Amino acid sequence: MDRYSRNMEMLTLEENISLRSKKIAVIGCGGLGGYILEMLARLGVGTLAVADGDVFEESNLNRQLSSDTGVIGKNKALQAKIRISTINPDTEVIAFDRNLTAENAREILSGCDIAMDALDGVGSRLVLQQACEDMEIPMVHGAISGWYGQVST
């Protein structure tokens, strides 16, 4: 538990242990999603289901954690899995190298305790919201643009 000793200032031992059994979906692995994924892994979440059909571009280098010059053209979800494995090998990452759609949402969200929206489009966000409602999975919405951000549940 030494890895998580600083968590004890905000979470109880039982809550820390509980995180290991949680499965959280993070949909969108770019700017916001990369930070969410990294913090959840550092916090000690047991399983992360990540989905993103996009690839890294040079314009991502200044703001996306999983990007570097060696991953240009590579899928964001697959690269997030690699990065998380070096940060916390105890966190299992199930990576989907495709965008969430109405057709694949059930597969991606299966068994998740909560879904994190880190998407950059309203259409895909509505698909996620509907799937979460249908599957009775709580959803946390997040968005950023420049110096502004928003979060809601």
Identify the function of each model-found stretch.
Residues 14-15, 103-107:
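Short acidic active-site motifs
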Residues 45, 50-88:
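Glycine-rich phosphate-binding loop and adjoining beta1-alpha1-beta2 segment
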